[in-house]
Regions:
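Active-site-adjacent structural elements in folded domains
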Residues: 45-47
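Short amphipathic alpha-helical coupling elements at transmembrane boundaries
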Residues: 6-10
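Hydrophobic cores of alpha-helical transmembrane segments in multi-pass integral membrane proteins
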Residues: 1-5, 16-42, 51-82, 86-140
Length: 140
């Protein structure tokens, strides 16, 4: 957690790049908690081949790579090109992306914990709401 120690005691300005970096930490840690749950043998046996594993993998992957790519772009683009990007628009992009990623993959965690299997052509009607939440989050 050296990322948090770097910010400790500092004067933090929440620019768009910093918001994407903090969003990375939040999504990476929340997705990582899913990995801790999957480390338990009995739970892993139950949740294997469910959407819980898909939600865990993608929350860590998207939270880890895409958020940092956006942070890097917002930080380095003005330094490379000499043109500033809109902070207001960047913060809108951050919040829409952060909430979209969280809603999409957290709904997958809940679906998988309730038994929604992967690689099935037709799902039970019980999972209609969680699939709807996943679609809404994806559309964000």
């Amino acid at each position: 957690f050296n990322w948090l120690a770097t910010m400790w005691g500092g004067t933090i300005r929440f620019t768009t790049a910093m918001m994407f970096a903090c969003g990375f930490i939040c999504l990476f840690v929340l997705g990582g908690f899913g990995g801790l749950i999957l480390a338990l043998v009995a739970v892993d046996f139950t949740l294997t081949d469910t959407y819980f594993v898909v939600g865990h993998f993608h929350m860590v992957l998207v939270g880890g790579s895409v958020m940092l790519l956006f942070a890097m772009t917002y930080y380095w683009w003005p330094k490379m090109t000499g043109y500033m990007m809109s902070e207001k628009l960047g913060k809108w992009v951050f919040w829409l992306m952060f909430l979209g990623v969280f809603v999409t993959f957290f709904a997958m965690h809940l679906s998988g914990a309730n038994g929604m299997a992967r690689r099935v052509p037709v799902y039970f009607a019980d999972f209609k709401f969680s699939n709807y939440l996943t679609t809404i989050g994806y559309a964000m």
